[in-house]
């Protein structure tokens, strides 16, 4: 009999979503969120100022497994999620206290009305990453594996719920993780990018410390990374037959494998973003949103 060195507490997002879909009136509001996307009456008269993620270009053009827009279909529920991973000291951050770090993996359904996105009763606590130290990049993949497995089922063929609030005879539901929001170190770990101290310090473009450095602000000359390039670099790292090959693949791109790349729609170049509050607290001024 084997005992785990570190037990990982995981909560099934399918069970959680089933409970949310049973709440009176909530399912209809979740379906209505797609009214802001391409082809809808709202999108034709939309103002330039965006009010919700559904106003953004990515979800306006996001396609499902059938190659068509992922928006609401009458016979299926199509929902998108924000993934967050954060580490904290459960013993509180005291000046003379112990340095302990425990992580949480959580989901927010972006189809919920914005005013309830972050209410505890409407957030999904997926897992608790055990301490006592913050998890390394390659180890965090093991904690993401069951979540990715569940969302592969959600993507195709979808998950059949026997009954929901609006569909007494059941309904197929498809879901996708379209946004990863963490502080900068956790965002890079989760998506497979190395820390900003690496030679390839940028997750958006191909700038390096040796050539452009940190002071080059002529962004018109920066070459943006593409989804295909990042995926090829991550696969080269994953399929390497030795540590030396992995080191070469990593050194040339600054990218390692992330479990999220098993999701066929996941795009490292636009799905991952540092949490806004950390940027503001760190006095980081953003002059252009990419």
Please place each PLM-identified region on the residue numbering.
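Domain-level detector for long, ordered catalytic/regulatory cores in large eukaryotic signaling
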Residues: 1-51, 55, 152, 156-290
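Short interface patches used for recognition in eukaryotic signaling and trafficking proteins
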Residues: 6, 125-138, 187
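A short, flexible low-complexity segment enriched in Lys/Arg and Gly/Pro that occurs
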Residues: 56-71, 149, 180
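Acidic, metal-ligating active-site segments
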Residues: 61, 67, 73-133
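Intrinsic disorder
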Residues: 75, 79, 130, 134-145, ...
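Short coil/turn segments at secondary-structure boundaries
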Residues: 94-99, 120-122, 138-142, 190-192, ...
